Amino acid sequence: MAPHSADTAGLVPSDELRLRTSNSKGPEQEQTLKKYTLEDVSRHNTPADCWLVIWGKVYDVTSWIPNHPGGSLIHVKAGQDSTQLFDSYHPLYVRKMLAKYCIGELVPSAGDDKFKKATLEYADAENEDFYLVVKQRVESYFKSNKINPQIHPHMILKSLFILGGYFASYYLAFFWSSSVLVSLFFALWMGFFAAEVGVSIQHDGNHGSYTKWRGFGYIMGASLDLVGASSFMWRQQHVVGHHSFTNVDNYDPDIRVKDPDVRRVATTQPRQWYHAYQHIYLAVLYGTLALKSIFLDDFLAYFTGSIGPVKVAKMTPLEFNIFFQGKLLYAFYMFVLPSVYGVHSGGTFLALYVASQLITGWMLAFLFQVAHVVDDVAFPTPEGGKVKGGWAAMQVATTTDFSPRSWFWGHVSGGLNNQIEHHLFPGVCHVHYPAIQPIVEKTCKEFDVPYVAYPTFWTALRAHFAHLKKVGLTEFRLDG
């Protein structure tokens, strides 16, 4: 749909923009392209042999991996369709660089069914007018202001404050005072700072939006391992699954459910009688999110090789070491040291630890759930592996903001109050989101793309629990 506003000054016309950004080859080259199936591509799934599918073409990017500015993100979906991740992480001009790595085109085959949960086709994949325009506008903002979107000076100060607060509260909770109430006070702060590591440090680090220096960004991403959870598994679930297939049932691992399950977030999912009360008991169970991730989910993903519909990629030796050594380091400083040098009995220590993890779990659950599990968002139902709507427009339709221009919530939530902007531009440091938010909202209005922003966090949280109550009472429907 064309914009219904005449305010397009400085924009490249859509047709010209397509020509300038298209990665397609000429007619003679098209005829020489080899044909590959998804099964063929899936065999090339390591950093040493990395093929990607982007807009139906097959690319061998193995030689580019050592020079890739985004570091390991280039092979996070090695051997799979990476269309959505490629486009959301790269400026438009990078499309032109793809041609040199093109080795063929994707063709359907009888064996495609086993890869269907890793591939989803959106309308207007390469030439979605809304996305081309909003990307051009946001890129122009950063270029005209001479700003690197991956960098913001506040991030270093913020990270030092969070990590310092985490370890200070850890010490004060377990080693400083024998008073249970004093220790509980600091244990709760430890839980708060652990959540802040999750939303403010590792989130940007694992999205490649913390810094332009690859090694440093990777280290900041591994801060999640420092607080007990796995950065590798987080990238698989969040970057590979959630960002590619937001709110699409049976594709997005963030809304996955078993049958039966304690939670139901869409009417296309199985309903049990107790879902009528999920808006009550989930308020409590959300607190177990961090504990579940640390002690159960990460290991299940490793040993089963999947996170819901997402097939877990092969670990590199470095990723393997970070995964297991991170778990051992966490167990050592969190359990061994307090048991040897701490001032509390085993039972008191365990109670303090669980209390801290409940705070972490509630913070993470509430901040993420209000963005995608409310009545005002869409839960797309694909037909034949296709979604009716462009990928970018569907990112907006499946996501909400809250307090989008709040300095306080921008920092406390790690930019999750600007989830729409984050889903469109995951490679941008979250501190920049308030600046580009008006650009995104304005463009959405011009293209009739629904843009939902709750005025406060509490409004968004109430909307989430109202949705849980409504869905818990609604009968199963195939059409959502």
From Swiss-Prot:
Short sequence motif Histidine box-1: positions: 203-207
Transmembrane segments: 151-171, 173-193, 280-300, 322-342, 348-368
Pfam family, one: FA_desaturase
Keywords associated with the record: Electron transport, Fatty acid biosynthesis, Fatty acid metabolism, Heme, Iron, Lipid biosynthesis, Lipid metabolism, Membrane, Metal-binding, Oxidoreductase, Transmembrane, Transmembrane helix, Transport
Positions bound to heme: 68, 90
Ranges spanned by the short sequence motif Histidine box-2, renumbered to the chain: 238-243
Major localisation: membrane
Short sequence motif named Histidine box-3, residue ranges: 419-423
Top enzyme class: oxidoreductase
Gene3D superfamilies listed in its UniProt record: Cytochrome b5-like heme/steroid binding domain
UniProt region (Disordered), positions on chain: 1-30
Localization terms from the record: Membrane
Signal peptide as annotated in the record: none
Cofactors demanded by this protein: Fe(2+)
MF term (GO), any: oxidoreductase activity, acting on paired donors, with oxidation of a pair of donors resulting in the reduction of molecular oxygen to two molecules of water
Catalyses which reaction(s): an (8Z,11Z,14Z)-icosatrienoyl-containing glycerolipid + 2 Fe(II)-[cytochrome b5] + O2 + 2 H(+) = (5Z,8Z,11Z,14Z)-eicosatetraenoyl-containing glycerolipid + 2 Fe(III)-[cytochrome b5] + 2 H2O; an (8Z,11Z,14Z,17Z)-eicosatetraenoyl-containing glycerolipid + 2 Fe(II)-[cytochrome b5] + O2 + 2 H(+) = a (5Z,8Z,11Z,14Z,17Z)-eicosapentaenoyl-containing glycerolipid + 2 Fe(III)-[cytochrome b5] + 2 H2O
GO biological process: lipid metabolic process; long-chain fatty acid biosynthetic process; unsaturated fatty acid biosynthetic process
Domain Cytochrome b5 heme-binding: 33-107
The enzyme's E.C. designation: 1.14.19.30
InterPro entries: Cyt_B5-like_heme/steroid-bd (IPR001199), Cyt_B5-like_heme/steroid_sf (IPR036400), FA_desaturase_dom (IPR005804), Fatty_acid_desaturase (IPR012171)
GO cellular component annotations of the record: membrane
Membrane topology classification: Multi-pass membrane protein
Primary role: Fatty acid desaturase that introduces a cis double bond at the 5-position in 20-carbon polyunsaturated fatty acids incorporated in a glycerolipid that contain a Delta(8) double bond.
Comment on protein domains: The cytochrome b5 heme-binding domain acts as the direct electron donor to the active site of the desaturase, and does not require an external cytochrome.
UniProt family annotation: Belongs to the fatty acid desaturase type 1 family.
Protein name: Acyl-lipid (8-3)-desaturase
Organism of derivation: Physcomitrium patens
